[in-house]
Amino acid sequence: MKEVAPAANLVIPKLIVGLGNPEPKYDQTRHNIGFTGIDTIANIWQVSLSENRKFKGEFGEGRRPKAEKIYLLKPLTYMNRSGEAISAVVNWYKLPPSCVLIIYDDMDLPMGRLRLRLSGSAGGHNGMKSAIAHLGTQEFPRLRIGIGKPKNITAERGEAKTISHVLGKFSPKENKLMTQVLELVVDAVELSLKQGIEKAMSLYNNRTITENPVSKPPS
């Protein structure tokens, strides 16, 4: 039985972007979970990423899950200038913004949660502010990965604690949880490529990964 081709009106990503900061000190931090997401996807899809000066980032291309070409990008411009790299790729390949899927961290989502949307505001995220400014629209899909909020936050130390939380690294226990979350990210992206963002939204926006997952029943 042949697989049914996606309908023409479905939103299918062509460029998948992960947001983060390029210096080694930011590796594996909560704010760089977008970079980690792209690295995970590239590893599973066997796509080689290399620095591309024209695109101001690490860039790779492959064919997944069918014969269609897919582009992966990690902007190396620092977070608040991410849009420069994104627009460079979009302009070069003449891609509409609706084909750009951006993966990034979200404090308003608890750890263990994903949230796919077709469009929306930056929500205070500097990388997304830059992306929206350079693409000239909010009408492009995004995948937010929950990193949770810092505990015991106070009005006096709120901003400092927030920055420390965002730029801090996951604990060993949190890393185990995020490994499972990243597997979910790959699944959601692959479904988006096959059946569109809307289908992935319906299946993954209500999924929660817990620290002590219940064993799946036999299929």
UniProtKB/Swiss-Prot annotation:
<keyword id="KW-0694">RNA-binding</keyword>
<keyword id="KW-0963">Cytoplasm</keyword>
<protein>
    <recommendedName>
        <fullName>Peptidyl-tRNA hydrolase</fullName>
        <ecNumber>3.1.1.29</ecNumber>
    </recommendedName>
</protein>
<comment type="function">
    <text>Hydrolyzes ribosome-free peptidyl-tRNAs (with 1 or more amino acids incorporated), which drop off the ribosome during protein synthesis, or as a result of ribosome stalling.</text>
</comment>
<comment type="similarity">
    <text>Belongs to the PTH family.</text>
</comment>
<comment type="subunit">
    <text>Monomer.</text>
</comment>
<feature type="binding site">
    <location>
        <position position="26"/>
    </location>
    <ligand>
        <name>tRNA</name>
    </ligand>
</feature>
<feature type="site" description="Stabilizes the basic form of H active site to accept a proton">
    <location>
        <position position="105"/>
    </location>
</feature>
<feature type="active site" description="Proton acceptor">
    <location>
        <position position="31"/>
    </location>
</feature>
<keyword id="KW-0820">tRNA-binding</keyword>
<dbReference type="GO" id="GO:0006515">
    <property type="term" value="P:protein quality control for misfolded or incompletely synthesized proteins"/>
</dbReference>
<dbReference type="InterPro" id="IPR001328">
    <property type="entry name" value="Pept_tRNA_hydro"/>
</dbReference>
<feature type="site" description="Discriminates between blocked and unblocked aminoacyl-tRNA">
    <location>
        <position position="21"/>
    </location>
</feature>
<dbReference type="InterPro" id="IPR036416">
    <property type="entry name" value="Pept_tRNA_hydro_sf"/>
</dbReference>
<feature type="binding site">
    <location>
        <position position="80"/>
    </location>
    <ligand>
        <name>tRNA</name>
    </ligand>
</feature>
<comment type="function">
    <text>Catalyzes the release of premature peptidyl moieties from peptidyl-tRNA molecules trapped in stalled 50S ribosomal subunits, and thus maintains levels of free tRNAs and 50S ribosomes.</text>
</comment>
<feature type="binding site">
    <location>
        <position position="126"/>
    </location>
    <ligand>
        <name>tRNA</name>
    </ligand>
</feature>
<dbReference type="GO" id="GO:0000049">
    <property type="term" value="F:tRNA binding"/>
</dbReference>
<dbReference type="Pfam" id="PF01195">
    <property type="entry name" value="Pept_tRNA_hydro"/>
</dbReference>
<dbReference type="GO" id="GO:0072344">
    <property type="term" value="P:rescue of stalled ribosome"/>
</dbReference>
<dbReference type="GO" id="GO:0005737">
    <property type="term" value="C:cytoplasm"/>
</dbReference>
<dbReference type="GO" id="GO:0004045">
    <property type="term" value="F:peptidyl-tRNA hydrolase activity"/>
</dbReference>
<keyword id="KW-0378">Hydrolase</keyword>
<feature type="binding site">
    <location>
        <position position="78"/>
    </location>
    <ligand>
        <name>tRNA</name>
    </ligand>
</feature>
